Every structure is written in structure tokens, then in C-alpha cells.
Amino acid sequence: MQIDEQPGNAIGAAVEGFDHATASDADIDALKSTIYTKKIAVLKGQDLSPQQFLALGKRLGRPEAYYEPMYQHPEVTEIFVSSNVPENGKQIGVPKTGKFWHADYQFMPDPFGITLIYPQVIPEKNRGTYFIDMGRAYDRLPEDLKKEISGTYCRHSVRKYFKIRPHDVYRPISEIIEEVERKTPAVVQPTTFTHPMTGETVLYISEGFTVGIEDQDGKPLDEELLKRLFDATGQLDESFEHDNIHLQSFEQGDLLVWDNRSLIHRARHTTTPEPTVSYRVTVHDERKLHDGIQAA
């Protein structure tokens, strides 16, 4: 296995010769260290079945299936499927997922530490995923803004981007919203926390899932504060030219693994009617999102 920093990129590394089936514990430790410090590891030359992809995920931590079944792979439920390509006339997975800034499972009480994405069918145009390193973004905040958010908490919810399921057709929207709030109530996390693997300070907000900010007593703060944070970190830049934004491209055989604690991401969906399919596995590693979350 050879790990090389991606040339010209501030974050990321290319990993050649990685085989999850034969990798030693030292190889796995080196890979995970790269994920935490370089944020994105691109495993090159991968050719895996769904079962093998899950096995790779298990080398890095404990996989968890997505809570809504319509996203799950029909044979391997721990695989989340994003696809606009029907199989035998049947929709497998969900098309155009993640077209907004977010961290995976940010709206849940116990988010994942590591995300793995394995593109299956890659469009010719507009391929890739946008990322923002929220540790680096925090470092770049003005000092007065850092002081303003010190000791605050943010509320995260899936409600804004929840996708209607097949069995929701003809149901009253109020009934669907009530179910969403009951199954996935908003969660509160510190606005910033110390990354347990690197010691860096992470700004844990996303335009997609973060819906409010409050003081340490739970009193809501002005929504304008959140908007200023979104703007300062680059999440409101629709040109995607902000200094904080990194576009990670990929080719057939690439498998992306990234640090879900400090990165937020946004899918770059093709604007042309091209087929696109990707698989995702998300895993819990040795530590919780931050040390303020109690171990189960």
C-alpha cells in the first residue's frame, strides 16, 4: 500500500495498492490516520461486489444501515444507494441525494465518524463532490465571530430535506411532518467541538441540516448569526469558488473515504440526463463524534 498526498490539493491523499482482504492492522491504522489528518483518502483501482464493499467498511469500524429502507441496497442493507438508473424496471435507491451542504447523519444523536463512497456509474459531466473542511473553516473565522459562538449549541434536523417515500403518496403533508418529527426529532450538538482523533476545533454546522443556534441555557439566538457562519464558511457561495470549497473528482475504480466529523459535503449532480449510481457505507469508529457524547 502506498499513500501519496494529492498534488495541488490542500486536502486529500491517493492510496494505491490497498486490498481490504489482505491489509494488515498496521495498514488499516495508517489509512485511518490519513483519513483523519488529510480528510479524504481516495482508494484507487477498487473492484468490489456490494458484499466486499461492506467488508471493507467493517475494517474501518462498525457500519450502520440508513434508517429509511428505500435508500438501502436490496442485498446489503448497510449500503445506501444513490441512483437514477432503474434495475429491471424498478427504482433501486434514491436519485439526486445530498445536493446540499451536510455531514452524514448530522441530524441524529450519534453521527458516524467515517463515510465511504464507491461510485458505480459515473457521468461524463459534472462529476465529483464538493467538500469544506470545517476545522480549517473555523480557524479562518474572524476572532469576533469565534467569540460570539463560544459556548453555544446548534440544533440539527432532517426536516428541510426529507424525501417523500412511496407509501407517503396521498398522505396529508401534516401527517408526514408529524411522523418525521417523531422518528427523527431535532438534535442539539455544540457549535464547536474538539476532534477526538486530531485535537483540532471543528465548527459543526451545515446549511442543509442546521436549523437553529442557542446559548448554553437553550435560549434561541438570532438566526442572522447562523447565516453569517454559513456565509463565512462558503456554504452560501453558489459559484463554489470560495477558498474553503474543495472539489474532489473521481474516476471508475476510485473509492472515497473521508472524515465525517470535520468535513461537510455537497453532491455535484449532473445537469444532463446521464446515468449515475453510487454506493455509500457509513461507519462508527473507536470514538464518538466528540467526547461530550456518552459511549453506549
Swiss-Prot record:
Cofactor: Fe(2+)
Annotated positions binding (3R)-3-[(carboxymethyl)amino]butanoate: 66, 71, 98, 105, 163, 280
Keyword flag Metal-binding: yes
Residues the entry annotates as binding Fe(2+): 102, 104, 265
Keyword Metal-binding on entry: yes
EC number(s) recorded for this UniProt protein: 1.14.11.78
Keywords assigned by UniProt, alphabetized: Dioxygenase, Iron, Metal-binding, Oxidoreductase
Reaction catalysis annotation: a (3R)-3-[(carboxymethyl)amino]fatty acid + 2 2-oxoglutarate + 2 O2 = a (3R)-3-isocyanyl-fatty acid + 2 succinate + 3 CO2 + 2 H2O; a (3R)-3-[(carboxymethyl)amino]fatty acid + 2-oxoglutarate + O2 = a (3R)-3-{[carboxy(hydroxy)methyl]amino}fatty acid + succinate + CO2; a (3R)-3-{[carboxy(hydroxy)methyl]amino}fatty acid + 2-oxoglutarate + O2 = a (3R)-3-isocyanyl-fatty acid + succinate + 2 CO2 + 2 H2O; (3R)-3-[(carboxymethyl)amino]butanoate + 2 2-oxoglutarate + 2 O2 = (3R)-3-isocyanylbutanoate + 2 succinate + 3 CO2 + 2 H2O
Other remarks in the entry: Isonitrile formation goes through two consecutive, but distinctive, 2-oxoglutarate-dpendent reactions catalyzed by this enzyme. In the first reaction, an Fe(IV)-oxo species is utilized to generate a (3R)-3-{[carboxy(hydroxy)methyl]amino}fatty acid. Then, its conversion into a (3R)-3-isocyanyl-fatty acid likely proceeds by decarboxylation-assisted desaturation. In PDB structures 6XO3 and 6XOJ, the 2-oxoglutarate seems to be in an off-site binding mode (overlapping with the substrate binding site), which is not the binding site required for the reaction to proceed. The latter seems to be inducible and requires His-269.
Role played: Involved in the biosynthesis of a unique class of isonitrile lipopeptides (INLPs). Catalyzes the conversion of (3R)-3-[(carboxymethyl)amino]fatty acids such as (3R)-3-[(carboxymethyl)amino]butanoate (CABA) to (3R)-3-isocyanylbutanoate (INBA) through an oxidative decarboxylation mechanism, thereby generating the isonitrile group of INLPs.
Protein name: (3R)-3-[(carboxymethyl)amino]fatty acid oxygenase/decarboxylase
Organism: Streptomyces coeruleorubidus
Lineage: Bacteria, Bacillati, Actinomycetota, Actinomycetes, Kitasatosporales
